[in-house]
Amino acid sequence: MGTRREFVAWLSGLSLAGLARPLGADQAVEDKAGAAAQAWLDLVDGGRYGAGWDAAAPAFKSMVTRDEWDQAVHSVREPLGRCLSRTLRSHKLVDALPGGPRGPYVVLQFETDFEQKAGVVETVTPAFGSDDVWRVAGYFIR
């Protein structure tokens, strides 16, 4: 498939491809999705990549094995060092992503400063599951 960085980008489900149809603003939904994204990012920030995979949405898990995820995200995140700060820059509630099942999803874009690189853009896309739980379905870092 190419480099591991491309693989992690692919995992994002093309969430920012501009093909997602907006549903409109629903702050309570976005807040719940944002809390799920933050809890998941806490796992990844702590180097608990396998636990991040365990906590991810089924669609995420169907695209990559736990070991593949661990290797791919390790190769992208470790060189950046520890997360120093993360600021939410945008959020968008959508009902579909290219190639994915119907949503809803919330596409969250953060500006993140790491020890070795500032101004990194992270996109985290939680999906609302059939069990009424928000779980991360996509992660893209550039």
Predicted regions and their residues:
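Short, low-complexity N-terminal intrinsically disordered segments enriched in polar/charged residues
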Residues: 2-3, 9-14, 19-48
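Generic hydrophobic alpha-helical segments
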Residues: 14-15, 59, 76, 133
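Short solvent-exposed beta->alpha transition segments
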Residues: 34-36, 50-103
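Structural motif
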Residues: 44, 78, 129-131
